[in-house]
Amino acid sequence: MSVLLITYDHSKVDPGQDPVPMLVKKYKHVQLSDGSYAIETDEKTLTIFHKILPYLSRNAHLFVVTLMQPFSGQGLDHENDWLWKHLPEY
């Protein structure tokens, strides 16, 4: 399994129609910020990208990136713990 970072322009999505929170609930995940999630999946970055893209406006930014250890970050304890537990080592 790999861990993917999904980050998108949360401000350009209608909160009532934001697909990302519903999509990530299908995976082991952690929310890192309003528009960023890490998910654990066997799916490819492009597959996840194409699942989300149709719901975003044309000018919204979307990135899906593979994550690995080591990493550096400043977040809540449960976010850091989740990343240390789930991220594979480089």
Please provide the spans of the model-predicted regions.
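Short glycine-/aliphatic-rich beta-strand segments at the starts of folded cytosolic domains
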Residues: M1-H10
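Alpha-helical structural elements
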Residues: V3, M22, L32, R58, ...
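Short, flexible beta-strand-to-coil junctions
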Residues: D9-V13, L67-Q69
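Short, flexible N-terminal segments of the mature chain
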Residues: D14-S36
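Short, intrinsically disordered low-complexity segments
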Residues: K28-S72
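Short, low-order "capping/linker" segments at domain edges
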Residues: T47-K51, Q74-Y90
